[in-house]
């Protein structure tokens, strides 16, 4: 499956997850969170995926955290979401994943990107 803001690849038993918004320092918006939720749900259920490595595209940032510009725009448009619909904490919402997750931090890691 292909995604807009995240690259997901499986090589052997390793899942590679790349945050792919280098022009926004890989900041996470609601769409990114939705994609990450789907990716990590699939990863957790896949018996052939033994571990995941998450990194950021580009050379400036691993992840700048929440995309504040997108959040402000959504709020101005009346699209503010709360609870599970907010799509935040895509990775950390499930602390009981039995598989290792490795963060290959390459550059800035701030806020929720840390």
Where are the regions that the model predicts?
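Phosphate-coordinating loops and pocket residues in cytosolic domains that bind phosphorylated ligands
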Residues: 27-30, 64, 73
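A short, acidic beta-alpha loop adjacent to the nucleotide-sugar donor pocket found in many GT-B
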Residues: 25, 106-108
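An acidic, glycine-rich surface segment that forms the CoA-thioester-binding/catalytic face
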Residues: 35-41, 68-106
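Conserved CoA-thioester-binding segment of acyl-CoA-metabolizing enzymes
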Residues: 1-55, 59
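Short, active-site-adjacent cap segments at secondary-structure transitions
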Residues: 59-63, 110
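Active-site-proximal glycine-rich helix-loop-beta segment
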Residues: 112-114
